[in-house]
Amino acid sequence: MPQIVDHRAQDRNVAAGAPVQRLETGQAALLRCLISGGDERLDCDETTGLNMYGHGPSPRQRDLAFGSSTASTISAAAFSAVSTYYSGLRHEMESGSSAEIYEREIGQIRHDLLRLLGLEQSPDQSRVDAILATSGTDIHLFAAALLAREDDQPLMTITLMGNETGSGVMMAASGRHFMARVSSDQAVAKGEELREGDATRNATVAVRNKDGSLRTDLEVEEELRGLIELARAAGLRCLLVVTDVSKTSLLAPSLETALRLKARFGAMLDIMIDACQFRLSAATIRAYLAHDFMVALTGSKFLAGPIFSGALLCSPVISERFRSRAVPAALADYCGKAEWPEGWAAREALTHRANFGLLLRWKAALFELERFFAIPEEKVIAVLTAFAEAVTARLESDAAFDLLESRPLDRSNLWGASSIRRWDEIPSIISFYLRNTHGAGVLTAAETASVYKQLAIEEAELAAVRIGQPVRCADFGDVPASALRICLSAPLIVAACEGATALSDLIAQAMTVLDRTADMAARVSAESGHGQALLASA
């Protein structure tokens, strides 16, 4: 089956997943830099050269890469661009100040991100600001730090449960260390408050019932309203995090709910859009900022940049509010002055610390964003539509799969009545259970995890299959079940627009991924034994 790959400039000497010590000095320095300046999630195994997500810092061109909802390996084209860029930086640093070079270049990243999103302003205009971060989870921590004890009121953050967002989000959103090591390489006490006495708390809301079906918008809104009422009565401020989109491609809570709650509770309620999947158009992001919602983005999901890189966008109103806010001294272990906007008081707590790993990861992500935005929207819509229709039809007709319930991505409250079709209304993450073909029901969460892990193993005759890691979505009886996800990324869409057969090749490749997944599921269910740990009620 033909694979969609970028045949432009690429470094043939880079071995997929090879440990850095096997490569020549220049490449080794680049690969070490790409996985530096973050927490332990970036660490690569010395033997395999891969991190906990099964990805390394060098291109893996054979992979069937449909797992961008979790993580991606840098593309050959982005790697080539970053390699050239890094070589220039190293040459410049032979005679120049690395701190000054970093401050200039990370400032350019901020400028380029805002430019690509259509957020450039002239000097006399109020400006949108961007805080850069080493991951999306860090952004939740930064937002909690900025809002903690504003007007001397404790903060309560409200997020979706971690199965739809991220494993560390709830801890970060409560102002606590969410990993054991931070980007400065300092060890920290996971779960400990960044600033003692902030007393930030986090509440979570489920968007699915126990059987995996979706709760109604009304049910979710009533629960949220109750939580915010209790917070107000206790003298707390609230930050509501709206996820657009979640791990299983949900916009939740709904925008109608968010806007109604904002109208009801006013200034005591702030809203942040968790758009860390970055499956949004520039126009949608601008519309959110026009509502004075904060917007969290990352470069490592839809954009398929190397893990991890993040940004928190703040509208002019929010920027003015945050400009004078102090942050905990402990935040200096997470970021340096240059990652924060000039003129912000938060910079006073931070040091001049360069994070060239973050710089390179954002450079790769923006390379992919620029290529994606260069594709006419009608072509993007055509690719997304064809992919979604083909994959959905296969999942509905194949006895090996069960589609996970989802709902349309409704952003009509941003636009009003409009007949214009936007590319980000078409799902690029499609979630499904694996059925037990040797009995009844679906595979257990443990069996699904086994399928996922075995698919990712590269063999002599078979490329590794990269799909979105299992998401715990349901309990059938007392047995947990998880859904897998097949996803499009910006590089896949770009590649699908590059030739007469490219789109059909993309869909054929997706069908191969589903073939391989069904085969592995059948093997795992057979090995687990007939009737053992099966979910007969699914």
Outline where the language-model segments fall.
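Active-site C-terminal subdomain of aminotransferase-like
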Residues: S300-W423, T517
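PLP-dependent enzyme catalytic core of the Aspartate aminotransferase-like
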Residues: M1, C473-A538
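Conserved small-domain helix->loop->beta segment predominantly found in fold-type I
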Residues: L369-A483
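Extracellular distal adhesion/interaction modules in secreted or cell-surface proteins
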Residues: C33-A81, S98, D217-L227, I457-G477, ...
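Disordered regulatory segments flanking catalytic cores
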Residues: Y102-E120, A463-A474, A490-L492, E498
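Conserved N-terminal alpha-helix of the aminotransferase class I/II PLP-enzyme fold
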Residues: H7-M52, P59, S69-D138, L146-Q153, ...
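Well-ordered, non-membrane alpha-helical segments in soluble/globular domains
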Residues: A78-L89, E103-R110, D217-L227, A252-R264, ...
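Conserved PLP-enzyme active-site core in the AAT-like
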Residues: I131-G136, H140-A349, N355
